[in-house]
């Protein structure tokens, strides 16, 4: 891809900004907090933040911009939310109208950006502990699934949780649980382990987003809350305009993955 996965966050963002890199960000910038993204009109921002507060597992807020300001200085010195995400999704009245790599022509002075922690953040800790992460090994995006788990509504925002799935060796499930629990700003501990049917998932080979990965003998499917959840909720709210990241294509911040608070300090 022309950009090494261990490059620092600023170098990766610069490559994204220039158009040189536009792929998924799983496994990139080890040690840094990766973020899901929601951009919406200020008139709906408070209701959306209420929704996130009521559903912290799938929606851990780590950054909020000033109204109309595309910069996110609390997450990094040079982050421009209009250019620094590899791929964006554009929704108008609840309809996905396209995916783009730059939203400067869509930016207006009434938009608010909300960054939410991503489970890609704790994957580096799993790998360091010797726990295999299949989609990183395979070089693909993490599989994501819609579930039957209801969310707590706020204003026009409501829906069901989306989860990521990682096959974990059965003997390592407790270890993976304990490690990810140390990252509440990145969805924290798993929400379920084992039978996907209990979550309303019919077939692990057919993810709703991302790429399918094999669950090998001796492995157990483990499910974490996922930041595509608020993306679906925003779509279903049918706002005149909202912008999100494309699944798997995250904002990479300068905040340490294990920071007690998601505030960048130079």
UniProtKB/Swiss-Prot annotation:
EC main group: lyase
Gene3D superfamilies attached to this UniProt entry: PSTPO5379-like, PSTPO5379-like domain
The keyword Cell membrane belongs to this UniProt entry's keyword annotation: no
An example Gene Ontology molecular-function term: lyase activity
EC number annotated for this UniProt entry: 4.2.1.-
Keywords noted in UniProt: Lyase
Claim: Cytoplasm is one of the keywords in the record: no
Highest taxon listed in the record's lineage: Bacteria
Family: Belongs to the D-glutamate cyclase family.
HAMAP family: Hydro_lyase
The protein's name in its UniProt record: Putative hydro-lyase Jann_2570
Organism for this UniProt entry: Jannaschia sp. (strain CCS1)
Lineage: Bacteria, Pseudomonadati, Pseudomonadota, Alphaproteobacteria, Rhodobacterales
């Amino acid at each position: 891809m022309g950009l090494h996965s261990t490059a620092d966050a600023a170098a990766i963002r610069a490559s994204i900004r220039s158009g040189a890199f536009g792929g998924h960000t799983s496994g990139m910038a080890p040690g840094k907090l990766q973020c899901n993204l929601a951009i919406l009109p200020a008139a709906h921002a408070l209701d959306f933040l209420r929704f996130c507060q009521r559903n912290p597992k799938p929606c851990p807020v780590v950054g909020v911009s000033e109204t109309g300001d595309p910069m996110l200085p609390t997450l990094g010195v040079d982050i421009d939310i209009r250019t620094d995400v590899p791929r964006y999704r554009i929704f108008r009245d609840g309809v996905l109208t396209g995916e783009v790599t730059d939203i400067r022509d869509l930016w207006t002075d009434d938009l608010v950006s909300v960054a939410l922690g991503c489970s890609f953040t704790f994957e580096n800790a799993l790998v360091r502990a010797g726990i295999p992460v299949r989609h990183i090994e395979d070089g693909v995006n993490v599989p994501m699934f819609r579930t039957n788990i209801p969310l707590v509504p706020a204003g026009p925002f409501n829906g069901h949780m989306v989860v990521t799935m990682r096959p974990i060796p059965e003997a390592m499930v407790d270890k993976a649980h304990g490690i990810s629990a140390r990252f509440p700003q990145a969805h924290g501990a798993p929400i379920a382990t084992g039978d996907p049917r209990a979550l309303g998932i019919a077939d692990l080979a057919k993810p709703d987003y991302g790429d399918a990965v094999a669950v090998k003998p001796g492995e157990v499917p483990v499910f974490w809350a996922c930041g595509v959840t608020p993306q679906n909720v925003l779509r279903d709210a049918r706002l005149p305009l909202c912008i999100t990241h494309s699944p798997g294509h995250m904002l990479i911040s300068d905040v340490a993955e294990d920071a007690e608070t998601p505030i960048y300090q130079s």
